[in-house]
């Protein structure tokens, strides 16, 4: 079935209402410009959608609220995107990752406790 892929720009603010508005605008755009494109949903894969994020992120944070807009499909064991986006670089030892932001501190503690980040796949109904 046809889908519309959602690209999540790095560093974009993930305020829930702004995200809802963006999705509504995308629906209107596709209905107006591509009326014959019978897509079934908006689809994305990202570290932001990983279900395990709830194990270390602050409840109610923008990332978890953003992920809640999606119906989860599955998680994938690919930590590289998380590490790159949160820490900026790959370190050989977990102890060497920076802990300057709340997210960095929380993810580092999660890693040191044996947690494994990943990617999530999800969709938003048309």
Task: Describe every region a protein language model picked out.
Residues 1, 123-126:
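GNAT-family acyltransferases
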Residues 2-80:
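Acyl-donor binding region in acyl/amide transferases
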Residues 20, 25-27, 32, 58, ...:
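Arginine residue identity/basic-tract feature
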Residues 65-124:
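Accessory, usually C-terminal, subdomains that scaffold auxiliary metal cofactors
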